[in-house]
Design a protein with these regions (language model features):
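N-terminal signal-anchor module of multipass membrane proteins
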Residues: 1-34, 282, 287
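Long, contiguous internal "core" modules enriched in hydrophobic/ aromatic residues
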Residues: 8, 15-17, 35-37, 43, ...
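Membrane helical hairpin/interfacial module
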Residues: 18-91, 95-98
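Selective recognition of specific alpha-helical transmembrane segments in multi-pass small-molecule
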Residues: 50-58, 191-201, 284
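Juxtamembrane boundary at the C-terminal end of a transmembrane helix
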Residues: 280-299
């Protein structure tokens, strides 16, 4: 039996961009703390963060056609603090405001208060977690209704945020790109953790009491979404970046790692992480099968 997904690619883009924005801001804070001399790389993270989140919000607004027909629904969304979506709006609003203030201060070459960076960091991580919780509250979909999903989306958000900053940085600030070795080593482990979390999520979902859980997993690993899952997510998004970064960080000579060729190999790895981050969300949104309740009169 086939099912029409209740959400599509636009929602996947929103979830991806919102998480990436939070991860990019967290990366900028990481650079400030661990590599304070890399000002240009720090600016890249501060620039990416608000822009991609705002783009994601615009996509969400265009997709939410019902809200345009009934604007009161958006107003009510701000008053229902028992709703995950309400808290998501709060996190997003605070994050965008803080990220824009930080960006303006940076562009004006003024010192950004540490407390402001901390607020932005917390809100950015909350946004990343919220993107997983938004799906997780849908109890009728075993693939979504898991406590692992917010953790998975958080790890993926930080991974894609760092990848975006490094990918832009390799062209905008190549000298600083070679200096952030600690961040690169931290980033190396994120796709590995992501792989473990995805495997755990699929294992738990497959053994859900409802057949919908098994059908969702089979749709990913051997069904309609299998090619995208194995090729674009697993190979391009996880395996390729892990192999390339392992080569660059631990096997290649330092002269090659810091050469332009080495930088381009790292850039390819970061591009793969971004592809995998988007595919993760698209696959989870699209492959989820709802629980079907059959009434006696339907038999």
């Amino acid at each position: 039996m086939s099912y029409e997904p209740i959400w599509g690619a636009i929602i996947a883009w929103y979830l991806f961009l919102a998480g990436l924005g939070g991860g990019a801001f967290a990366t900028a804070v990481f650079v400030r703390y661990r590599h304070p001399d890399c000002k240009r790389l720090m600016r890249v993270g501060r620039l990416i963060a608000p822009i991609v989140v705002i783009i994601g919000l615009c996509l969400l607004m265009f997709d939410a056609t019902a809200g345009f027909h009934n604007p009161l629904r958006f107003v009510l969304l701000l008053t229902n603090f028992g709703s995950v979506m309400t808290w998501g709006v709060v996190f997003l609003a605070v994050f965008v405001v803080v990220a824009l203030i930080v960006l303006v201060l940076d562009l004006m070459k003024r010192e950004v208060p540490m407390w402001l960076d901390c607020v932005g960091l917390v809100m950015g991580l909350c946004v990343a977690i919220y993107t997983g919780c938004l799906l997780g509250v849908c109890q009728g979909f075993p693939l979504w209704n898991s406590a692992l999903l917010p953790i998975l989306f958080l790890v993926s958000a930080v991974s894609t945020g760092m990848a975006a900053v490094l990918l832009v940085g390799v062209f905008y600030a190549p000298d600083e790109f070679n200096e952030v070795v600690v961040m690169k080593k931290f980033h190396f482990w994120l796709p590995v953790i992501e792989f473990v979390l995805v495997a755990a999520l699929l294992f738990i979902t497959a053994f859900n009491p409802s057949p919908a859980g098994w059908e969702s997993v089979m749709s990913l690993v051997s069904g309609n979404w299998a090619v995208a899952f194995w090729l674009l997510f697993v190979i391009v998004g996880l395996v390729l970046p892990t192999i390339l970064e392992c080569w660059m960080l631990w096997l290649a000579k330092h002269e090659f790692e810091t050469s332009r060729t080495g930088q381009m190999i790292s850039a390819l790895s970061d591009a793969g992480v971004l592809v995998g981050g988007f595919m993760l969300r698209l696959l989870i949104v699209s492959a989820a099968v709802p629980i079907t309740i059959i009434q006696p009169w339907m038999l």
